[in-house]
Amino acid sequence: MATVTARLPRARMNLWRLEWLRLRRTPRALTLAAVFVFFGLLQPLLTKYQSQIFRHVGNGVRISFPAATPAQGVGGYIGELSGTGLIVVVVVAAGAFTFDSRHGLATFLRTRVTGLWQLVAPRFTVNAAAAALAYVLGALAAWYETALLIGAPDAGGMLAGMLCAAVYLAYAVAVTAFAAGIARGTLATVGIALAILFLLPIAGVYRPVSRWLPSTLANAPVDLLRGTHHLSYYLPAFAVTVVAIAAALAVAVLRLRAREI
């Protein structure tokens, strides 16, 4: 009995290490970092030279833009938090949570844990941390490029924005786990997760609830840079997002536990 008990913590620890190695030794981590860093370097460049770009694209038609501000330089990158960057995060996370799509892998993993939470927790934590790190790397690239081409953005706003983005990306990973509890395949999981993430902001048109929506955190970095709001303004969204993350993971575990392999 003591031998079996001693093996359980080791098995749990190995699952954490397994998820870390799976992310690091495959193109997933590199893809995440590359996408965010690419847009972090590109968007300030596009913002700085948008007049020249439109002149070439528009067959010589001159279009004048006001002088770019540091907030605009970084703002283009922040937009990827609700666009390409978000899609890549969901696709990578879906690959981790849809282990039931492969019968052999599902059997192997499920027979080595005493509860489904031991499978979900490492996948959520590692993928959320990887997404946050990738975003921060891209934000640092955008920060450097903007300071070089346009002017230095507000440091406090940048750091507060990184915090908001990290929490929102953790929410996106939790929503993906929830979707994996509904659908078995990777493609269906990605579709459900993106539908939730893209449709939820529509509720923000009703002003009384807009401050409480997790999607508010996706736009927060821009407002923090512009000085429109302070970090305390987003405390309701932080609270709701944390509760939503816990609820999504709990439902994911319950759904996965009830699923037949």
What are these regions (language model features)?
Residues 1-16:
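Short, membrane-interfacial amphipathic segments enriched in basic
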Residues 2, 243-261:
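Junction motif at the cytosolic side of a transmembrane helix
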Residues 2-6, 28-29, 33-96, 120-187, ...:
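Secretory targeting signals
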Residues 22, 99, 112, 143-147, ...:
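Transmembrane helix-loop junction
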Residues 44, 113, 131, 201-202, ...:
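Hydrophobic transmembrane alpha-helices of multi-pass small-molecule transporters
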Residues 95, 99-103, 177, 254:
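Short helix-terminus and kink motifs of transmembrane alpha helices
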Residues 108-115:
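Short helix-to-coil transition segments within interhelical loops
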Residues 208-229:
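Short hydrophobic, aromatic-rich alpha-helical segments embedded in or entering the lipid bilayer
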